[in-house]
Amino acid sequence: MAIEGVLNEGFVTTTADKLINWTRTGSMWPMTFGLACCAVEMMHAGASRYDMDRFGVVFRPSPRQSDVMIVAGTLCNKMAPALRKVYDQMAEPRWVISMGSCANGGGYYHYSYSVVRGCDRIVPVDVYVPGCPPTAEALLYGIMQLQNKIRRTNTIAR
């Protein structure tokens, strides 16, 4: 958080936008939407070796408690309405991370009749994490990119 000025009396001044965005980046609660093998890497990123808790990332089981959705794996046509329904149940502000080649653009199954060619056709995606499957480090980098994106947004309308 950028501090605008520190006064001699011990006060810290900053803008409300920067304060709100600082709290949002330090307490991101993702809801996992694991569909295929990328979900294993997502679980690996949440385990003790990578420990996403140090970034303020705590996995939540309910869409009403989460503000980030991680779509990991192959999205089929049959699962697309469920993805949209879960996304609509999330409270604002909400963000989406697309994890893996299949979630990004269909991946290996791109030409299959039953595969959605990218989850961005169903929900708006903020960060794309490439790979088949992407490593836990790649997901952590994607989370850091999302935190940078949140820091740059204007929260309070002017």
Curated annotation (Swiss-Prot):
Disulfide bonds: none annotated. PROSITE patterns: COMPLEX1_20K. It is an enzyme of class 7 (translocase). GO terms for cellular component: plasma membrane; respiratory chain complex I. The keyword Cell membrane applies. Binds 1 [4Fe-4S] cluster. The keyword Transport applies. It is a peripheral membrane protein. GO terms for biological process: aerobic respiration; electron transport coupled proton transport. It catalyses: a quinone + NADH + 5 H(+)(in) = a quinol + NAD(+) + 4 H(+)(out). Its main location: membrane. Pfam families: Oxidored_q6. InterPro entries: NADH_UbQ_OxRdtase-like_20kDa (IPR006137), NADH_UQ_OxRdtase_20Kd_su (IPR006138). Its EC number is 7.1.1.-. Its cofactor is [4Fe-4S] cluster. GO terms for molecular function: 4 iron, 4 sulfur cluster binding; iron ion binding; NADH dehydrogenase (ubiquinone) activity; NADH:ubiquinone reductase (non-electrogenic) activity; quinone binding. NDH-1 is composed of 14 different subunits. Subunits NuoB, C, D, E, F, and G constitute the peripheral sector of the complex. NCBIfam families: nuoB_fam, PRK06411.1. Belongs to the complex I 20 kDa subunit family. This is NADH-quinone oxidoreductase subunit B. The gene is nuoB.
